[in-house]
Amino acid sequence: MALEKSLVLLPLLVLILLVLGWVQPSLGKESRAKKFQRQHMDSGSSPNSNSTYCNQMMRRRNMTQGRCKPVNTFVHEPLVDVQNVCFQEKVTCKNGQGNCYKSNSSMHITDCRLTHGSRYPNCAYRTSTKERHIIVACEGSPYVPVHFDASVEDST
């Protein structure tokens, strides 16, 4: 009797373990929108021309693990303002896609560029603060930024 129950429960247990093994990796995966926020949003601080800002932020935001990310931009505006860019001027992305949008107004940003000769694991960045229009790629529901495409100067 106990053996029969075990034989019935064993396939069920195997099925549950297979489903958990298939679902679990996707549970911990960062969404593109969350990745955008981690890599590009720094709403809580004002633009900082401190020369160590990029070195600290690139490490803190996990962009120097396994390699040095060559270029990154942080936006110092409220998240809702950056999300609203997805409903502003539509432009073509650098890769030719049609899901990019340019901000109507300039935003405070910090550009981080890997310094010449800098090599992993000693990633060193040049910090420069600017006021620029940003261009972001948007997707999803809700429609939100998932990629920082560029920053451009005011054309006036």
From Swiss-Prot:
Residues where substrate binds: 35, 38, 69-73, 94, 113
Residues linked to a glycan: 50, 62, 104
SUPFAM superfamilies (alphabetical): RNase A-like (SSF54076)
Chain ranges passing through the membrane: none
Enzyme class: lyase
Subcellular location: Secreted
Annotated GO MF terms: lyase activity; nucleic acid binding; ribonuclease A activity
Tissue expression per record: Pancreas and other tissues and body fluids (indicating it may have other physiological functions besides its role in digestion).
Keywords: Disulfide bond, Endonuclease, Glycoprotein, Hydrolase, Lyase, Nuclease, Secreted, Signal
InterPro entries in the cross-refs: RNaseA, RNaseA-like_dom_sf, RNaseA_AS, RNaseA_domain
Residues the record marks as active site: 40 (proton acceptor), 147 (proton donor)
Record-listed E.C. numbers: 4.6.1.18
Catalytic activity line of the entry: an [RNA] containing cytidine + H2O = an [RNA]-3'-cytidine-3'-phosphate + a 5'-hydroxy-ribonucleotide-3'-[RNA]; an [RNA] containing uridine + H2O = an [RNA]-3'-uridine-3'-phosphate + a 5'-hydroxy-ribonucleotide-3'-[RNA]
Recorded GO CC terms: extracellular region
Disulfide bond entries: 54-112, 68-123, 86-138, 93-100
Signal peptide as annotated in the record: 1-28
One example of a Gene Ontology biological process annotation: defense response to Gram-positive bacterium
Cited function: Endonuclease that catalyzes the cleavage of RNA on the 3' side of pyrimidine nucleotides. Acts on single-stranded and double-stranded RNA.
Family, as annotated: Belongs to the pancreatic ribonuclease family.
Complex and partners: Monomer. Interacts with and forms tight 1:1 complexes with RNH1. Dimerization of two such complexes may occur. Interaction with RNH1 inhibits this protein.
Name used for this protein in its record: Ribonuclease pancreatic
Source organism per UniProt: Pongo pygmaeus (Bornean orangutan)
